[in-house]
């Protein structure tokens, strides 16, 4: 709420400390914590879960992936980048679940799907760590103006061809992800569900 946008190393420190506080609260009783980033005085959860909820850590870069392996109960990622899951395993993630979000844009017309993906999800075409470093929405809007349709469709399967969607999903399965969810970019959710139920999911099982 108005704080500065810290550099990535500080954000990861904050995440690790926040997870520590969350788990202490889930263990029950009064919790006090005096850390580098957070202070908690005599906090308590009165309605406790029957067991600790799993903490899935989202990560894309090497430092975040190593943190996810060390403190997380699982990994969430957006890219089948080479070596990512190996680093996760080496940091303590071996045997933990790996979730991938796969961006897709189904529409009956491929050109329409490409335009929709570019209009609604230009972040998919931003290179490197740019999207993680922009602190305010206006910066996202400015960066989005530099993204081309071709940049977005490099990572987003678009249109009605099931082969393109299957090929896109298999990149994540082949990389070692064991859970995938598909994010439909665009308004036709019913059409997307029907297409995946009939044409895509049976060929991925």
Give the positions of each predicted feature.
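Active-site-adjacent structural elements that line small-molecule/cofactor binding pockets in enzymes
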Residues: 1-205
């Amino acid at each position: 709420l108005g704080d500065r946008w810290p550099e990535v190393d500080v954000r990861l420190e904050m995440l690790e400390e926040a997870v520590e506080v969350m788990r202490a609260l889930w263990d029950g009783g009064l919790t006090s914590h005096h850390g580098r980033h957070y202070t908690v005085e005599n906090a308590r959860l009165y309605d406790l879960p029957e067991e600790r909820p799993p903490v899935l850590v989202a990560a894309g870069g090497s430092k975040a992936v190593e943190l996810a392996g060390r403190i997380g109960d699982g990994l969430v990622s957006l890219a089948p980048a080479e070596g990512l899951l190996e680093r996760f395993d080496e940091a303590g993630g071996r045997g933990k679940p790996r979730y991938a979000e796969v961006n897709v844009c189904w529409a009956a017309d491929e050109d329409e799907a490409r335009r929709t993906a570019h209009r609604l999800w230009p972040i998919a075409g931003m290179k490197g760590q740019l999207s993680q470093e922009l602190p305010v929405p206006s910066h996202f809007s400015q960066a989005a103006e530099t993204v081309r349709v071709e940049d977005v469709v490099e990572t987003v399967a678009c249109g009605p061809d099931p082969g393109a969607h299957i090929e896109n999903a298999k990149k994540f399965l082949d990389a070692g992800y064991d859970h995938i969810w598909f994010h439909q970019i665009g308004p036709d959710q019913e059409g997307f569900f029907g297409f995946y139920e009939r044409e895509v999911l049976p060929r991925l099982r």
